[in-house]
Regions:
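Positively charged n-region of N-terminal signal peptides that target proteins for export
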Residues: 1-5, 21
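C-terminal motif of bacterial Sec signal peptides marking the signal peptidase cleavage site
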Residues: 15-19
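Active-site-proximal alpha-helix that buttresses catalytic centers in soluble enzyme cores
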Residues: 21-208
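Sec-dependent N-terminal signal peptides
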Residues: 4-13
Length: 208
């Protein structure tokens, strides 16, 4: 039922954006459809590329999470900090929390993050736990290729948004990685369909 509620919205958005692209060679600039948000954290730009593609395809609004103490552009330079935060389930500060009233208007929130030490970036958890997300639809996406890491990262997002509704609804151990991720890489971050053959548009159709 949860997926069915999202199908018309995503497919309508995809169709509308595709129609616009046939008459205008310039990139679309979404104005936002009012009830969907793409919320993401990105260090190297991989997650950002996918987040921006989702916005282009759906017309959602977008917000990039910034850490109060910025991470290095290359996460390997911050590996000790990242590992410490992940293994100890810490909550680093967020520099740009949204007003609670501003977030409350969204019914559907895409949540994007790299997988760091089998977890989403902990700053994403800090952000999510700052709000009442009861009954909102949360759709996680990640940039990393290992299915084990993706399952563990999904479990963390589900845990910190336990009162929300989730797509996918369940998380079996053998979950197909393509159902929850469109991994980005430095050499394909600017490609129309990053990460795999079906790309972001195919992923949206699968989850929708």
């Amino acid at each position: 039922m949860k997926k069915l509620l999202l199908i018309p919205l995503l497919l309508l958005s995809l169709t509308t954006m595709a129609a616009c692209s046939t008459t205008d060679d310039t990139p679309d600039t979404p104005s936002g459809n009012g009830n969907m948000l793409v919320l993401y954290f990105s260090a190297e730009g991989h997650t950002q590329a996918i987040a921006e593609r989702i916005v282009k395809l759906t017309g959602a609004d977008i917000h990039r999470i910034e850490a109060a103490e910025p991470y290095a552009a290359n996460p390997y330079d911050d590996s000790d900090r990242i590992q410490h935060e992940a293994y100890n389930d810490l909550r680093p500060g967020v520099a740009n929390l949204l007003d609670k009233e501003a977030l409350a208007k969204y019914d559907t929130i895409f949540v994007g993050s790299p997988c760091w030490w089998h977890q989403p970036a902990m700053v994403v958890c800090t952000f999510l736990e700052a709000y009442d997300l009861k009954d909102k639809v949360i759709i996680p996406f990640f940039t990393y290729g290992a299915t084990t890491y993706l399952n563990e990262s999904m479990q963390k997002i589900y845990k910190v948004t336990s009162t929300s509704r989730h797509i996918p609804e369940t998380l079996p151990e053998d979950l197909d990685a393509e159902d929850i991720t469109t991994p980005g890489r430095p050499d394909d971050a600017d490609i129309d369909m990053p990460g795999n053959a079906n790309g972001t548009e195919g992923w949206l159709h699968r989850i929708g």
